[in-house]
């Protein structure tokens, strides 16, 4: 479906951003340079803005939604894993949000933090910069070390390259040999 305007709200898509076929970007959504929205992801900015920073990726089946007067702000160089729900929250720069995690209203994830796969970050939680958050409900487990920081960087670098490959339609078509 791609980018969809609604009355008084039209997506602003940087020319270098990638929106995969089947993804929906609706309403007051801004996608920064070299950001990517992957297959079956939905960004629904119908009640407040959604802003996605440069080089940020929203992987397959991710949902980003807002509440009346409560935007979703996703910083630069952020990796958002498959099937994540981001609801009216703020994710600062250089974070990694693990697959299947859920961030509820008024959550703020500090710069350089990691949310572990499957974590549920409760409404209003303020995560300090450089934290590893995990569990249901989520709690700060420890500080992000150099290895995790490298993983964050590797994720967004990989998705910038993948977006270019998908834009060109450059897929390996050989069947694996068993």
Give the positions of each predicted feature.
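Glycine-rich hexapeptide-repeat left-handed beta-helix
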Residues: 1-12, 46-62, 66-74, 81-178
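N-terminal first-folded block
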Residues: 6-11, 15-51, 67-69
């Amino acid at each position: 479906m791609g980018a969809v305007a609604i009355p008084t709200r039209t997506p602003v898509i940087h020319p270098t951003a990638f929106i995969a076929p089947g993804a929906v970007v609706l309403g007051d959504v801004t996608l920064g340079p070299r950001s990517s929205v992957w297959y079956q992801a939905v960004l629904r900015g119908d009640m407040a803005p959604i802003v996605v920073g440069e080089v940020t990726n929203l992987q397959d089946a991710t949902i980003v939604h807002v509440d009346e007067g409560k935007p979703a702000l996703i910083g630069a160089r952020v990796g958002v894993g498959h099937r994540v729900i981001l609801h009216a929250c703020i994710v600062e720069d250089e974070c990694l949000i693990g697959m299947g995690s859920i961030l509820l209203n008024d959550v703020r994830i500090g710069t350089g933090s990691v949310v572990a796969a499957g974590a549920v970050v409760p409404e209003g939680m303020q995560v300090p910069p450089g934290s590893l958050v995990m569990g249901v409900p989520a709690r700060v487990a420890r500080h992000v070390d150099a290895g995790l920081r490298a993983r964050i960087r590797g994720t967004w670098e990989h998705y910038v390259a993948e977006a270019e490959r998908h834009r060109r339609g450059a897929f390996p078509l050989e069947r694996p040999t068993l």
